[in-house]
Amino acid sequence: MDGKAIVQSVIKEIVQPGIHRLMESRYFSELREGKLSTRRLQGWAIQHYLHNKAILKSFALGMVKNAHDQELFNYYTYQFNEEQTHPDLAKKFGLALGLKEEDFADATQIFECQIHSARTIYNTLTGGGPLSRASALTSESMVCRYSEEFNTYLRKNYGLNDDALTFFTVHMVADKEHTAQSAERIALAVKTPRDERVVRENAQYMVRIKLGKFEGIYQAYA
């Protein structure tokens, strides 16, 4: 099978339309118009902080679970190191919006964000291997695009500065590298029709999770 062609097909048919739907959601439509409430922006900061903490724990579990496999151990170690500062970057954004440390300490994940974190942990613990990277490819492609949107319109409409927006400027660059790495791993791993189906399902599920996450934040922080 042509793994590279399959990856490109998934990007064209699933990931890119998913990004378009996210950008057309009411969360980002209101962001561009300058009408998105500070409360809903704070909601993203809190929920993404909690999600990033869960990701770190997932990668730590992946390191332990795969200690016998040097390649996978190295992979989870790399991911852990890459993500280690991200909870604090999300928190920094929230603090710039007026949140306090106790807001993060007292917070719990909303249902839709629990689903996102659970999917990440599921992929780590069930040993999905390279095929499960379709979730990461999709998620990080969407993060990269929405980081551009946040970076542009939080400056334009909300007057935030470089320091407050560090999370987004980092992800505009880093996630391009991460998506390229995921695409390469997936392309090498796809060998059978079932593999292709798993890749497409992982991408489709992550689009649904991401769309649900932002709608959930919009509603929970009304």
Where are these regions (language model features)?
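Non-heme di-metal
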Residues: M1-A222
